[in-house]
Amino acid sequence: MPTIFVDGQEFQVKEGANVLEACLSAGIDLPYFCWHPSMGSIGSCRQCAVVQYQNAEDTNGRIVMGCMTPVSEGARFSLNSGSGADQDSPSAVDETAIEASVQAPIDVPTKVPDKGREFRQAVIESLMLNHPHDCPVCAEGGECHLQDMTVMVGHRDRRYRGLKNTHRNQYLGPLISHEMNRCITCYRCERFYTDYAGGTDLSAQASHDHVYFGRHQDGVLESEFSGNLVEVCPTGVFTDKPLLKQYSRKWDLQSAPSICTGCAVGCNILPGERYGKLKRIHNRYNDEVNGYFLCDRGRFGSGYINSEERLNYAGVRDFNGEFTAIKAQEAIEIAARWMKAEEGEKTQKIVGIGSPRASLEANYLLRELVGKEHFAAGFGDRESQVVHRIAAILKTTRAKNPSIKQMETADAVLILGEDVTHTAPRVALGLRQAVRNKAHELAKQAGLAVWQDAAVRNLAQDQRSPMIIVSATETRLDDIASQTVSLAPQEIALFGHAVARAIAGQPSDDEAVNEAAAALKNAQRPLVVSGSSMLHSAIVDSAAAVADALTDLFQADSTLANSTPADSSPIDSSPIDSTPVSCNSMLSFCLPECNSLGLALLSEEQETLSRLLDRAEEIGVLVILENNLNRRLSEEQVTKLTSSGIKIIALELLDNDLLANCDLVLSAASYAESEGTLVSSEGRAQRYYPVFPAAHERLASWQWLRDLAAVSGHSELAELQHFDQITAACGASNPLFAALAGVSPDHNFRSHGQKIPRQTHRASGRTAINADVSVQEPLRKLDPETPLSFSMEGLNRDQPASLTPFYWSPGWNSNQALQKFQSEVNGPLRGGPVGQRLIEPQTNGISQSSDFTPLRIVQEGRWQLVPMHRVHGSDELSARTAEVAELAGEAFIAISSELAAKLAVVDGDGVKINVAATAGIDSLGLSLSVKILTRVAPNCVAYSAGYSSTLALQPGALAELSKDSDWQRATPQLIASDRSSHANASQNNPPSPDTDIDKGREEPRHV
């Protein structure tokens, strides 16, 4: 590690780092704007200027940009010293001189004590020339990086008295608000949106000193990661629009560490609450999983928690089918009475249905309450087959199931059957970084540091690491793929097995197969990605076969297996980890819901919904845990279940169609109001904590089940009083869950003798927050189940990383304060890892390769239905958030341009879909809107999966298509304006060009 000197102090720094990164990692506050740890350096803002000296005798030095200057052995720099390289107390600034400079009249220049600081102050002053004086009304106020840096450099008075450049703002959709006047042209937004996330509809548009960041015209941002602009932007240009509707300042938000429930990736999040409402979601850094970024479903998809359709009280249905709200204790007693046989009566058979969106602890309690043999996981039949198959593969494979950080090191990627951007969005963002490993390799050969972002991109141009996508339809990653192949699901499985054989030395007659095999064989860290979206277990088998073949290849060639990987990211160039060299091959699966893998490991295919239906007459009581069976069973199957005389008890968050047929409904708390453990698709168990107490008589599902067990006479479960005890019991029940106890500290943990506060020390209005209801000062809510408190009292420091509720440090009020919680910039958090991996690769794993012979289902005049998932609309809960529902649009049928011509339809027309009756499924007919795709597998059409109107469609079914002449096209969505001149004007009427949208400022000098 090189040794450098900063203001006379000696620091050992990371090899290959730049000066800015080295200073921040050492705890030195050096201002910056354009640099970002995940996006590298471009040196555009000039804010991180430091003075570099040639040697110890040099007293003049020269100004260099910290983010563009690599560290070297013995290098000498100064941030605050004006007297040369060898000042004894360099960090001590001449406060008298600074005070004099601040208090001096603005028209009389006063000398600043050193040229580095003077330069940084000049940069801030120039950035402020056109910046508005609107901090009190800016949504970024109080967590603004520009505010922090302005204070840090000591700039206070503005000398510029001229007119400011002003801009018109754009409508960018329901998620992002745009205020261009606050821009400081750091280029972070464009670099993230275009360079990092692959977006194409936001850019820098400029003419001399007039720079505008936005779209070419108003419209919804197309990227699935647009919400990250809120955190990437150091000012208030891009802000959280849903938050603006119910705004609270950062310091007033109550937060807790949590896990996103939008998909199975397991991204770490920080939900914020005020007035009993979930206000927003911010990214919670986890260097192994989501890093600095979230997808838009994860960031904006939790609005359903504030929905008026939330269940506040338990309800029991009477003989007339009407529900009556009852107290929680009464509901428990009714349920226990149903579950216990009265004297002389036959013992009731109790069956439980779990849920892949409920916590591991809640599913465990339900399984123990009803017995393993009477517990169904709650997957649909085909989903159950695929998910359990994935779980079996992960438990036995020799390949590594990688984290997203490890995926970013891949130098060749094969994707089988998944549109990853829509089924595991954060994984897709990681794969976009993986294809840049070719650029990093070229940079290394040219002697460029990979953090020199602009230079590396200019060097590589369009050269990328190979990515082969084999799918039924176009995907959002097609733009970076080296090869795309369009095949039906059963043919995708055949393709995968053919690639495995080609890797093993049996070439195929299909050149596409041989090209894919060659790309994987020539890679040092190949990655195979597949998943459950096609509901086709043969596809996941073929992915496992490819990973097995690659592992065999690495084991046969120890030289290749032990080779040192090339640099893989702007900061981190470490190998995968200490896993045996046979695990250089990586295998990752995309799963449908947040706890799908955890539930599969817990249930082990003990019961399926079909088998449960076959013996419905034997069941006395059915307990359904957070599972809307209308999404997993056909209408006929649901009717059969609910009309069989079974007493149905449902635990649920939101009202849905199934609940109308239940006898007792228990109001469950959401993830933001309860604690639990989720197992991600990586096999990482992670804990989430309540952000605020559950309102009314909502209880966490595990609390309902614990109380029900106690009243119904289940003595063993009745002894489990605390959540930690349930987690420990679950861990003891299965060797795979043995690490659960180490996921997070128990409820007795204290930091410096106190619980960890969920509120900042600046939280306001504690005694007056409910004054509109009662003037009586409310008691602080207690939380006996976690190490966190619903209070500002305590210390948010030195605790395990899994317990950090928010990021703040003196002088760092924005989310950039994160670097004060990291062991090094862009490195792991202090306080240990977040979560525990439950599944590791097996040294002597069982091969999953198997022969597969597909059924030939092509029929003239019929097309095979394949599911097409959407990041907005396919998920059950997030789709009930207003903004997500707006983006989801209507359900659709996606077809090729050739088929569209044959049917004489265009985008937006209607198509009738007729599906013939098959075993157990009646014939079906419906009409859907047409979406025309650039590529679709032959003889296939895709439908929007997860939408309520397409739930009856079955993957693989054959459908007849015809134009619907009676179809009514959807009303075009007009572009809305955020700045209407009339308070009651419709949002769908944009202002005219003559509208004065900023009356409080000078007249615009340009638009």
What do these predicted ranges mean?
Residues A100, Q506, D510, P526, ...:
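Long, contiguous, secondary-structure-rich segments that constitute the structural scaffold
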Residues D287-G291, K647-R687, D909-G910, V915-L951:
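C-terminal, active-site-flanking charged/polar segments
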